[in-house]
Every structure is written in structure tokens, then in C-alpha cells.
Amino acid sequence: MGSAALEILGLVLCLVGWVGLILACGLPMWQVTAFLDHNIVTAQTTWKGLWMSCVVQSTGHMQCKVYDSVLALSPEVQAARALTVGAVLLALVALFVTLAGAQCTTCVAPGPAKARVALTGGALYALCGLLALVPLCWFANIVVREFYDPTVPMSQKYELGAALYIGWAASALLMCGGGLVCCGAWVCTGRPDFSFPVKYSASRRPTATGDYDKKNYV
């Protein structure tokens, strides 16, 4: 596979991972708990995310409430907000940097400098994946630890939500895509010019007398 194809494939993976990271950041399903009371009519499921919590009744009715106070949130939620939003914004910067250094664009003159720009964009994407992985694993560790804690009531035990799995998949795509972009750019760092070759045909000049060569006539 050519270096340009590697860059394009890596950029596509990074874009999909970026969308998945935004989705994981906004979904209120980082922690999910399902419990049943003695009366099945009161069965409900509670979802908790970074920005709101939702309660889904057995009848299908869902009620969500946005967190009112930032200071009242737990430290892991505040840190997860900062790291996840930072990763999303950094991925946006990485997108522009990668597009500027990609071989299929003309934002930067072809050469080793252009390859280094693309290499920087791929490294930023990989950093985004690692940055998003920190709050995801931190949250998962807290949920699992509290789930097996005998002192926590059964009604307050949570399980891993779908947003965590989406975030893990997005982080993997960002790191893999960033690695592919770096591989495609690394191949071109030693080339003086890696732009697509364009062949030009030489124009025919007239003779000194202004007349065309006689052999052009039949």
C-alpha cells in the first residue's frame, strides 16, 4: 500500500474515531444500573453520564436532568469532562494539521517539511486516543470497584455503560489511524519531492525563418 493510501486510510479511521468520541462524551450512559422493586411496575433503569442523568421507567418513559452544579460533581466526573472535551478539541486541531500535510492536498509545498506536518497530525491523533483513554479506564475502574464492594447497597451498584465501550472503540480508532498517518508520512520524510509526477510535452519551435520544417508537409 502506498504512503498516500496509508494517510487517507488513517485519516478516515481518525474521523470515525473522532465522531465516536463526541458520541461517547455526550451520551448519558457511562454508568448504568438496573434494579427491580417488589412491584414490577416501579422497575426502572438509571443512566449517568458526564453532563446529565436519566431515569427510564418500565413503561418506556424517560426523564433526564442536567447536572446543575459543577462543583458538586465527583472529581472523576470533572476530570473526565476536561480530558474528553480536550481530546475532542485536540482532534479538531489534528484534522487541520493532517489535511495540511497530506499528500493529496496543496496547502504546503511538497517536500520533507510537508511530510513532517502530516507526521505531527498523526501524532496528535494518537495523543487524542491516549488522552480519551484515561477517563474511560478511570471510570471503568471505579464502577467495577464499587460493584464488588459489599458495603455499597444493591440499589446503588452500577455497571459499565454503552458510552464507555463506544469511547474505547473510538480511542482505538484514533490511535490506529494516527499510527497509519505517521507511517505514511514517515516514508516521505526523506524524499525531496513526493508530489504526484506530471509529465509535460515539449512544444515544437518554428525554424529561424519563421516557417515550419519542410518535413511536416506531405
From Swiss-Prot:
Regions of this protein lying in the Extracellular compartment? 29-81, 144-159
Membrane topology, Cytoplasmic segments? 1-7, 103-122, 181-218
Pfam families the record matches? PMP22_Claudin
Q: Where are the transmembrane segments?
A: 8-28, 82-102, 123-143, 160-180
- Quick check: keyword Transmembrane in the entry? yes
The entry's keywords: Cell junction, Cell membrane, Membrane, Tight junction, Transmembrane, Transmembrane helix
Q: How does it sit in the membrane?
A: Multi-pass membrane protein
GO BP of this protein = bicellular tight junction assembly; cell adhesion
Report which superkingdom the organism of origin falls in: Eukaryota
Q: Where in the cell is it found?
A: Cell junction, Tight junction; Cell membrane
Is Transmembrane helix included in the keywords of this UniProt record? Answer: yes
**What is the residue range of the signal peptide feature?**
none
Any Gene Ontology CC annotation: plasma membrane
Q: What PROSITE patterns does this protein's entry cite?
A: CLAUDIN
Region described as Interactions with TJP1, TJP2 and TJP3: spans on this chain: 217-218
| GO molecular-function terms, A-Z | structural molecule activity
Summarize the protein's role. Answer: Plays a major role in tight junction-specific obliteration of the intercellular space.
> What name has this protein been given in UniProt?
Claudin-5
Which species expresses this protein natively?
Bos taurus (Bovine)
